[in-house]
Amino acid sequence: MTHYTTLLFDLDGTISESAPGILRSVRYGLDAVGIHETDEKKLRTFIGPPLNTQMKKLYGMKDDDIVTAITKFRELYEEKGALFDCSPYAGIGELLSLAKAAGYVLAVSSSKPEPFVKRIIENFGFTSYFDVICGSDPNDELNQNATMSQKARIIAKTLSLLREKGHDTARLAKEAVMIGDTGYDVDGAHDNHLPCIAVSFGYGSREELAAHGADAIADTVGKLRELLGLETGHE
């Protein structure tokens, strides 16, 4: 397997078990436009992809309703603190610590709005592990006209920020890998000519990850450590 030196991590479903706060906030946003969703399986599909993408896909919502629902989502999630209704997966902090100590370059590449990403990472005590913490523009979820997927744009932005910090372009191209939990992460990585190690302990199924062409799949944090060449230990 390729020896990776630069690790780009998704947040929700990869570093963070974030379902409780997101699901409450999605319900709150949908309720505001008269959609009273009770199917938790359907609600969980909102974890990872941009909110506007899922709202249009599942309900065919009009743009004005999408704006209203996202605004109400953020009211509960950000202003009322639901974003902190989450926790890091067991063993992920140790993995990050080991990777940093071993000389890996670490970055967060999440489609969650960047201010939320930074606050959650700080709340977990993980900020010092990362050279770059990259999320979406808070208004990007309202953009209906982008030709490149939001995840692909964020991964591209993450790589650009790493280059600006002096990391070698050729080495990034050969030795960087995306780590995420959905087909959306796999596709975004491949759109940037990066491999993707997918984790099935998040919100995407193993079948979904395989169907999107994940380069490897880790079912546990311990397996992810093994794939990254880090010493094994307790998960």
Segments the model singles out, each with a brief description of its role:
Residues 124-135, 208-228:
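Structural recognition of alpha->loop->beta junctions
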Residues 3, 79-108, 114-121:
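Short, acidic loop-to-helix structural element flanking the phosphoryl-transfer center
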